[in-house]
Amino acid sequence: MIPGGGQPNMQQLLQQAQKMQQDLAKAQEELARTEVDGQAGGGLVKATVTGSGELRGLVIDPKAVDPEDTETLADLVVAAVQAANENAQNLQQQKLGPLAQGMGGGGSGIPGLPF
């Protein structure tokens, strides 16, 4: 309902929905191009992912490589990738959160949004 008791203008609502859809698509494209980093072991292992969570790079400092202890290296790689993905999720919330609120939700239940 519109203040004053009038009915909502369907054309206006449709235009608003189309604009929100375009804004969402633009933000998702921007996220796919943006890269964020995560690290573990004090920077011995660094992972780079896109804002949408795609792993793009992994850098391992030679100091982290111990042939006798590959398990620790594996743990550092997992931790770095998880940190990068957490940073990507934070970026997603920054970019897409305001759009989700504009669609009447707090970010929950909207297809394509991970939060």
Curated annotation (Swiss-Prot):
One of its GO terms (molecular function) is DNA binding. Its main location: cytoplasm. InterPro entries: YbaB-like_sf (IPR036894), YbaB/EbfC (IPR004401). It is found in: Cytoplasm, Nucleoid. Pfam families: YbaB_DNA_bd. One of its GO terms (cellular component) is cytosol. Keywords: Cytoplasm, DNA-binding. Binds to DNA and alters its conformation. May be involved in regulation of gene expression, nucleoid organization and DNA protection. Belongs to the YbaB/EbfC family. Homodimer. This is Nucleoid-associated protein SCO3619. It comes from Streptomyces coelicolor (strain ATCC BAA-471 / A3(2) / M145).
